[in-house]
A protein has these predicted regions:
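A low-complexity, Ser/Thr/Gly/Pro-enriched, surface-exposed linker/loop concept
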Residues: 17-62, 68-119
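Catalytic and substrate-binding clefts that recognize carbohydrates or anionic sugar/phosphate headgroups
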Residues: 6-13, 19, 66, 89, ...
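Accessory regions of macromolecular translocation/handling assemblies
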Residues: 2-4
Length: 217
């Protein structure tokens, strides 16, 4: 390799190349991402217009297991006929930093049933089913399974995390990082994921690979 090619290769490795942002494949985590995944639907409750579950980053089997563990809260609500809105967050802040716009909502009646083994919300033809034993969220339409979320499919990422310090520094008693929420949905052979808005990718998102040649791309 020439020096320029070696530099390009080194840069590709350090930045994760054109692969996934948080993982290298399914099992290997990117060294720049500190990942925490929802491992259990520990609590479930009905809320106005839907239901809410709280999922810790590890299974809680006794009181000691509830110490020093983060959580992801997920809310399911009906915003229009046959549409279920899903919102997941980790310790919601007072200030909304992400771009938001007003939605044209027409909330419908929902039915929520919570047992020892599962929590179910029905909104028209749509149903969301949460397994309270083994973490799994299943979405159904007219009784047919559409997709689901399971092991390591819902997570909170701390990207480029710098540990805190007790010295008078900018990160005094506060770790510095870029926070992200991630989720993955199961797909059957032949199913496609579509998307709009990106200028440099295909309309069908399955298995996309994005090559960027300019460093400022």
């Amino acid at each position: 390799m020439t020096n320029s090619k070696v530099d390009d290769f080194t840069r590709l490795i350090k930045t994760g190349g054109s692969g996934m942002k948080f993982t290298e494949g399914y099992w290997e985590k990117n060294e720049r991402a500190n990942a925490s995944y929802a491992m259990q639907a520990f609590t479930a409750e009905a809320i106005p217009g839907g239901m809410r579950i709280v999922s810790p980053f590890r299974e809680i089997n006794d009181r000691g297991g509830a110490l020093d563990v983060g959580t992801i809260t997920t809310e399911f609500t009906s915003i229009r006929k046959d549409i279920i809105s899903v919102r997941s967050y980790h310790y919601e802040g007072y200030v909304k930093g992400e771009p938001r716009y007003e939605l044209n909502e027409d909330p419908q009646e929902t039915e929520v049933e919570i047992t020892d083994s599962e929590a179910v919300m029905k909104a028209g033809r749509m149903t969301v089913r949460v397994d309270l034993k083994d973490f799994k969220i299943t979405y159904e339409a007219d009784g047919k399974v559409l997709t689901n979320i399971g092991f390591r499919n819902l997570g909170y990422m701390q990207y480029d995390r710098a540990t805190l310090t007790k010295f008078p520094e900018p990160n005094y008693m506060a770790a510095q990082y870029q926070p992200y929420m991630v989720t993955e949905l199961s797909l059957a052979p032949g199913e496609c994921v579509y998307g709009l808005g990106e200028r440099f990718t295909a309309f069908v998102k399955n298995g996309q690979v994005v090559d960027i040649w300019n460093e400022d791309g």
